[in-house]
Amino acid sequence: MIRNITIIILLVSTSLSSQDVLWPTRLGKFYSSNFGENRDDHFHMGLDIKTGGKIGIEVLAIEDGYISRIRSDYNGYGKAVYQRTNSGHEVVYGHLESFIPVIEKIWKLQQAKRQSYNVDTQFSPRDFQIKKGDLIGFSGNTGNSFAPHIHLEYRSSKSEPLNPLIMAFELEDNTRPIAKKLAVIPISQQALVNASPLPQIYPLFRDKSGIYHFADTLSVFGEFGFAIQAMDKRQGTNNIYQFHRIELFIDGQKEFELEYNKIPFKQGKFAKTIIQYDLERQNEGEFQKLYRLPEHKKISIHTTDHSGILGLAPGVHNVIINIIDAFGNKTVVKGVVAGTFPMTLEAEEVYRDKKMITLALIPRRGGLPIRDAIVYSFTPYGFADQKLDFIKSEKVKKDFHITLPISSIQDRILQIIGINQLGGMVNPYHWDDIKTKITALDVNPDLKISSTEHGLFFQITLDHFVKKTDAILKLANDNTFMSYSMSQIQPCVYITDKLSHDVVRNMKYIDIEIKSGDLSRQTRFHYNLKEVGPGRESYIFSNDRNCSMKTLPGTFYQENIVWINEVKEFAPIKKGFKLSPVYQLQPYDLAIKGKFQVGIRYDKELAEHSNLGIYYYNSKKEKWIYSASENNRRKLILTSVMETMDAITIIQDLDSPIINNIFPGNGGRYYAQDLNKISIQVDDYLSGIESNESSFSLLLNEKNIYPSFQPIKKTISYNLDSPLNKGSHKIEFTVRDRMKNESSTTIYFTVI
């Protein structure tokens, strides 16, 4: 009874606290981003409050308390006020244009004292006490900000970020979260989802009552996990938000839960482990995991000890996923999963005339009766053609007979996927009526290696279909080899089972054998596959030995395989000079825990060239980005430190930054009241401009001043303390890029 009373008191306390917190502007209560949004290498720790796209909106204290700290930086929150509240919380108001006048004066004095734009000043509880609703600053666009807004964080007494929509504000919201797609991820060695060892993505469909449903019964074998593409919305805005809580139930039992109430800063680095990172890197979108791998740390948003990794008994199981926003609006996803086991079939022709053909689908391994089937047609070159409709279908004892138009099989290969009586999918079977002379000697295999978090696949694609073909993988060295059979998953595509990462140990070559009848052809591929893992250093080299990686004890979450490909087709390099091949670090879709080192050797004739750097390709920004590099001219190698598996190359940057859109303009004449700010637009097309003070110098009448720099907009600005005197004035400005290319300008103007 005492425990129940305590819970009620806590709930009432939270509610009263929420009602007692003021919105920090006099504008509408709208925000563009909310707490917990995943930014790959961190979480968004607050609310991005809209200011109507304007700078200079009054920012109000949301509670009673005192200003405990001010800070200014080119990056992060830009200009920010920190408040300690009487309720014991810490509030951060970021991206401000300016502080209140008295704080602004202190800030300017601190800049002069430090001779720097960057200021970090603490205050005592007696210095600047404020009441709820007091003015504390004016909104802006400083720091890492894409548009004018206020970044507001609501933290605990220990400076741990809390969800403001749960702990501070109660905002009206009558819009339920949206569920879009479901991913099913095979985890264990032999796991299958709808007869495939690869991750599968399915759309979710909403009924008239608002409940979402799986498109069909899912068939699973072995251990697997769910991941979901879902978002929250709010009336009156088109923005997409992070939901507050999500629950996974299997047959009424809660198996997993995420709840975005608080996230300590030290846990931000684990953001990659919360999403299905490989799918995001493959441009499939952001899916949040409804499971946690053993090697991934449990963090504050994990509110249950269950891992969410599922191994279901044979039979039918009910799945419910609840998605809840901060206001309590709930979206429900329902589906059925059939726990099953691997099964195969064969197809035999039982009837044919000029218009139709009937095939008998006969269960083999697994032996359960077949109750339905899905059939796709493919061209001889392996391209999917269409899903075929049956003229008729019927169960005949354990078999399943399908009748198809004769025209649908002409010069086509049929991929037949049976469905057994439990709803489980049967491994694909390929049937054809093609008359061809192409044999194993006539086709060329293309090899693809996929290394997942718990195993790797070898997959080949043939450039033409070959009848009754087997494919075999051989991992060889100079003395011996290990062979692995490959399953046909499409007419021209074959894949191994998920293999342990250690199979590549001592491997020097990858041989693919294609067999059809008595004919056989073997193709050799050269990959330097290296087994890596946590707790040890490893060295990986490209085939030409000119590109290398050094992984560190803290680089990886789990055992894996790493290699380096030299690529022939790559994103265009529009500026600068490419001075090495482009190398792709693999696997490109692996979530990395820590940093690693890369190196690229260059030709001897480039030893005296300046401004060489390692660049990586950022697929989201669609541009080559400089990675801080060291040049060892004696060893003819550039080295850098990276955190993601990207394409890298050496580029030489000889172009200076661009200076444009300067105010006041050269030769300009201005009234003093019209001249309260210096503004300069800069840009650099290759190595970029570092967000630190060594990148700039700005003098007004031969006196150093300390401007702000907005790294997204690439704008330098300085607010004048007081009107300039009448007469002539001079601005001297210099900007440097990361390669120390430099541009300077001098502006003369007159105040009248």
Model region roles, listed by residue range:
Residues 470-483, 551, 588-648, 686, ...:
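Proteolytic-maturation and junctional protease-sensitive modules
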Residues 17-91, 97-102, 116-126, 131-132, ...:
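Surface-exposed, glycine-biased beta-strand/turn segments
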Residues 4-13:
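Sec-dependent N-terminal signal peptides
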Residues 201-248, 351-362, 448-459, 591-598, ...:
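Contiguous beta-strand segments within globular domains
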Residues 233-239, 366-370, 465-468, 607, ...:
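Extracellular acidic loop/turn motifs
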Residues 165-219, 336-356, 432-451, 653-676, ...:
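Short, compositionally biased P/S/T/A/G/V-rich stretches that sit at domain boundaries
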Residues 444-446, 531-539, 568-618:
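Proteolytic processing hotspots in large secreted/extracellular or virion-associated proteins
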Residues 172, 187, 199-342, 376-409, ...:
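Long, low-complexity serine/threonine/glycine- and acidic-rich segments characteristic of extracellular
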